[in-house]
Swiss-Prot record:
Species in which this protein is naturally found: Francisella tularensis subsp. holarctica (strain OSU18)
Active site (catalytic residues): 128
CC terms in the record's Gene Ontology section: cytoplasm
CDD domains, A to Z: Orn
Full protein name: Oligoribonuclease
Single annotated GO MF: 3'-5'-RNA exonuclease activity
Catalytic EC class: hydrolase
């Protein structure tokens, strides 16, 4: 059921961080209510990229995406960037009205840049505002009492979103008296 109070969480895995030369290879999405309760999850989608794109990944991406199995899932995938965008957009539309939710996640500006370039319909559907958990992480480092959120950093899109939601819950408890 659609609600303007629902939040759109997206995570991308890419072949690198340069939006002009790198590509999206995985996308996942979760919808939560404003209290961060998960309403629905979209299965992560591995996006096909040709071998020449994968060959241009940096050392970190090659190691990480090979260890998680993502590189092989990308090679085996039949799903284009456009098809993945359409699937995720259809998922979001079930739960969130047009431009009512900020885009939520960790260091979400990086994901937003890739969405704007490669999945502009998702980018446009989200409100221009962003809820970036990284901001609270930094504030906690500066002003917190030393407690920190321990991340697993699996670099799997759906796991990363779940972890971002849990991290925001942690900071809400530790930093915010609202």
């Amino acid at each position: 059921m659609q609600s303007a109070d629902n939040l759109i969480w997206i995570d991308l895995e890419m072949t690198g961080l340069d939006v002009d030369s790198c590509k999206i290879i995985e996308i996942a999405a979760i919808i939560t209510d404003k209290d961060l309760n998960i309403i629905a999850e979209a299965e992560p989608i591995a996006i096909y990229q040709p071998d020449e794109v994968l060959a241009n990944m940096n050392e970190w991406c090659i190691k990480t995406h090979t260890e998680t199995g993502l590189t092989q899932r990308v090679k085996d995938s039949k799903i284009s960037t456009e098809a993945a965008e359409q699937q995720i957009l259809e998922f979001i539309r079930k739960f969130v009205p047009y431009q009512s939710s900020p885009l939520c996640g960790n260091s979400i500006w990086q994901d937003r840049r890739f969405l704007a370039k490669y999945m502009p319909n998702i980018d446009e559907y989200c409100h221009y505002r962003m809820l970036d958990v990284t901001t609270l992480k930094l504030l906690n480092q500066y002003w917190g009492d030393g407690k920190s959120f321990e991340k697993k950093n699996t670099h799997k899109a759906l796991d990363d979103i779940r972890e971002s939601i849990a991290e925001l819950k942690f900071y809400r408890q530790e930093l915010l008296s609202i």
